[in-house]
A protein has these predicted regions:
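Amphipathic alpha-helical "lid/sensor" segments that cap RecA-like P-loop NTPase cores
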Residues: 4-49
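Accessory nucleic acid-recognition modules appended to NTPase machines
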Residues: 33-203
Length: 204
């Protein structure tokens, strides 16, 4: 598997729009990028089944497995967006408290992460809500039922999933280098926005 990864890195990847969305659609889970699994649908279906049956069940004694799968899908539809717990809960038909618990499970098991808003005492008009991201965009594309990169690039979430991909890659690059990454986003009430703000050594 390592040799396949090295060969892939040496070949390089396309950097045009088609190539980027191919990477987004494929995702970055080891089983996919190593070439061990050749059928993407089978891989992600198996991954989700194993994740819910094993990992989630280890964290909570009882859970509505089908409801939880629907919940992950509803969250995936909102990747790269401001977190709205009530909207996700409404889509799935669960309470806001249940939605908060299930988001906690997804965060604890490294399926999702949040970008907190950047703020200081001089910035009074900033939005306070975090933004929701998935670590793997291939999972997002699978959950939202995009059957190819070509369809995804013209889909309703094309901008949001591209942002998700960029933010996740930045975060993973810091993690892989063993570095802390203080990442934020900035948005004020006039809708002025910076997608990523990185704080290091007291500077932005």
């Amino acid at each position: 598997e390592l040799s396949k990864l090295q060969e892939r890195a040496q070949r390089g990847m396309q950097t045009d729009v088609t190539g980027i969305y191919q990477r987004i659609w494929n995702g970055a889970m080891p089983g996919m990028i190593s070439g061990k699994y050749t059928n993407r649908e089978t891989f992600y279906s198996s991954y989700l089944q194993s994740y819910i049956e094993r990992d989630v069940s280890d964290m909570v004694e009882r859970i509505d497995k089908l409801g939880f799968l629907d919940f992950i899908r509803a969250a995936a539809c909102r990747c790269g967006q401001l977190l709205n717990i009530h909207d996700i809960a409404s889509d799935v038909g669960c309470s806001a408290d249940t939605a908060k618990r299930w988001l906690g499970i997804l965060e604890k098991s490294d399926v999702i992460f949040y970008l907190r808003p950047y703020s200081n005492n001089l910035l009074k008009r900033t939005i306070k809500t975090p933004k929701l991201y998935f670590f793997d965009t291939g999972l997002v594309a699978y959950l939202t039922k995009y059957s190819s990169p070509e369809i995804l690039v013209n889909g309703a979430i094309n901008g949001a999933i591209l942002e998700n991909y960029a933010v996740a890659e930045i975060r993973k690059s810091y993690t892989n280098a063993g570095m802390d990454c203080l990442m934020h986003y900035y948005r004020d009430r006039d809708s002025k926005e910076v997608d990523v703000v990185i704080e290091a050594d007291g500077e932005l």
